[in-house]
Amino acid sequence: MERLRMMRAPLKYVQGKGALLQFHKEMEYMGKRWLFVCSNSGYNSCHEDLEKSFEGMDDYRRYEVFGGISSISEIKKMQDIVETDKIDVVVAVGGGSAVDAAKATAYYMGKRIVIIPTVAATDAPCTGLSVIYNDDGSFNKYLFYPQNPDAVLVDSSVIAKAPVKFLIAGMGDALGTYFEGRASLRTESPSLESGGITRAGMSIAKTCYETLRKYGKAAITACENNVVTPALDAIIEATVYLSGVGADNVNCAAPHSFYNGVTSLGGHEACIRERGVCAR
């Protein structure tokens, strides 16, 4: 039987300078009790503006600093908090591992999930999957979800203030989206959702690649100077949204297989996508 072609993406995507100040306005329809799963840097860079967005509101908020990797034990810890605090919405605030752990927590507990990436180092915020690790940092599995996140909110000023190495890593990750998708299409492989690859999915992946080539150098300069520019905004969209939605609707190929194997060799302090780029 011929594969059904399909597309999926986050239900809502918000990006721009000062977006954190609009968090409650944009997300209030989801619930009243919020668990923010934060990296250390994510908490420091976002907590103040998030609280400003809740001014005058009586919503319950709990900020929990994330333990480092999206491991089985860390996800279980967050699940327990959701249950005891009667949480409505899980919010990831941080990089790829915090995002993956929060997505898994929301999925297992049947809650809504919002993603606030604080670096543009991976396309994890927009994808419908998590990378799960063992407690020693080695790869465990991909956890696939029936849908993508309920919402993704990116404050461009937060990304501009993050170390430029993370932006470069995200560009390296996004660089492979089109070529991995093209390889999958040529070999008639299924998409990550086990369906046929759509023209829309390939168009998004190609636009991601073209955006990187056109704006990448200027975006790096902007990030080095901690300023938001049209070029930086374009690259943020490419690394977070275009790469994530593109990858979800095409497929991965050799670079991701290479990365998964390398995690078993140690050296987990290296930026995730630095390993992936080596395979490209």
Predicted regions and their residues:
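Structural motif
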Residues: K12, R33-L35, R61, D88-V91, ...
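Short glycine/serine/threonine-rich phosphate/pyrophosphate-binding segments
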Residues: L20, Y43-H47, I72, S97-A104, ...
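Short, well-ordered alpha-helices that flank and scaffold nucleotide-derived cofactor binding pockets
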Residues: K25, K52, D80, A104-Y107, ...
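ATP/NTP phosphate-donor binding region
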Residues: M1-V89
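A glycine/threonine-rich phosphate-anchoring loop and its flanking beta-alpha core
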Residues: L11, Y107-A200
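A short, small-residue-rich loop immediately preceding and capping a beta-strand
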Residues: V82-T105, M109-T118
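Active-site segments that bind and position negatively charged phosphate/pyrophosphate groups
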Residues: L192-R280
